[in-house]
Amino acid sequence: MNPMTSTILLMTIMSGTSIVLMSSHWFMTWLGFEMNMMAIIPILMKNYNPRSMEAATKYFLTQATASMILVLAIIINLMHSGQWTITITENITASTLITIALVMKLGLAPFHFWVPEVTQGVSLSSGLILLTWQKIAPLSLLYQIYPSINTNLLLTMSLLSIMIGGWGGLNQTQLRKIMAYSSIAHMGWMIVIMIYNPNLSLLNLFIYIMMTSSMFMLLIANSATSTSSLSQSWNINPTITTMMMATLLSLGGLPPLTGFAPKWMIIQELTKNNSVILPTLMAILALLNLFFYMRLTYSTALTMFPTMNNMKLMWQFQPTSMTPMMTMLISISTLALPLTPLFISLS
């Protein structure tokens, strides 16, 4: 793809998300979502093969359906309240439809089926945008309307997402699908705390974006797309492989890494609100995620496929391609647990 075209499309994606973040008017919010969707589709198709075309089509159909439901909800809300303001969402039907539309855009269960398929069909760089930046706008809108959301509906979807995100990733060998199921599970953790402490949900989103961006950058640096390619990465680049192992364990929420902090704070907040069964179930289901991250870590660092003798020396002659941005992201993703008191004060 032409660099100028890529720049224009990325600027349009950022503009669409910014419009959603800054708007208090339903029409401008819908416009921001549409700008965002129309700009990312060419980025998903940049490899231009049948798989990326199929992935882009699935993404378009899902997002277009969600936008139609959102417009219907906006019209119903306008008929009852006479207001275009986002925070005035008094009608139960409109509120439920808006929640369903935003959950479809986020890829939460039971509307999660498009996420693994689309992520698997696109390149690693497109998957990075899809699983990080594209989550910001729907979550910011949920943050604004959370007082009028049906609590039981949101909690059910959250718990289902954590469950499916764990179970779905168990039998996967493709890294992009594993990251997609990981995203579904992390979204479940973010949404479950939205009702009790929305600021903590935004903090969780920030940490999730840091960890997922680090992981995708390491996969791009290693050109790894499956578990078998990870098994050969230690011979080629041990530095990046070690960092990948730490980032994977952080994504799984293993202490003393950064990924443990949001899970710790969310469970603490839920227990403060006299909820015991829900955080217990969430903690148990989080072990499913941790299991497939541990399996990936084992494939990455503790196994080696049979290789030629000269391949074992490749890392001595190949420079490690680390950028300052990647170094900063990996540091935040793995070593920020001592900053937990600061995170608690911010939430």
UniProtKB/Swiss-Prot annotation:
The family this protein is said to belong to: Belongs to the complex I subunit 2 family.
Enzyme class: translocase
Example GO biological process: mitochondrial electron transport, NADH to ubiquinone
Broad class of the protein's primary localization: mitochondrion
Pfam families for this protein: NADH_dehy_S2_C, Proton_antipo_M
Catalytic activity: a ubiquinone + NADH + 5 H(+)(in) = a ubiquinol + NAD(+) + 4 H(+)(out)
Annotated function: Core subunit of the mitochondrial membrane respiratory chain NADH dehydrogenase (Complex I) which catalyzes electron transfer from NADH through the respiratory chain, using ubiquinone as an electron acceptor. Essential for the catalytic activity and assembly of complex I.
Keyword Nucleotide-binding listed: no
Protein name: NADH-ubiquinone oxidoreductase chain 2
Subunit structure: Core subunit of respiratory chain NADH dehydrogenase (Complex I) which is composed of 45 different subunits. Interacts with TMEM242.
Upper lineage: Eukaryota, Metazoa, Chordata, Craniata, Vertebrata
Transmembrane annotation, as ranges: 3-23, 25-45, 59-79, 96-116, 122-142, 149-169, 178-198, 200-220, 240-260, 274-294, 326-346
Topology in the lipid bilayer: Multi-pass membrane protein
GO cellular component, one term: mitochondrial inner membrane
GO molecular function: NADH dehydrogenase (ubiquinone) activity
Subcellular location: Mitochondrion inner membrane
The protein's Enzyme Commission number: 7.1.1.2
Keyword line: Electron transport, Membrane, Mitochondrion, Mitochondrion inner membrane, NAD, Respiratory chain, Translocase, Transmembrane, Transmembrane helix, Transport, Ubiquinone
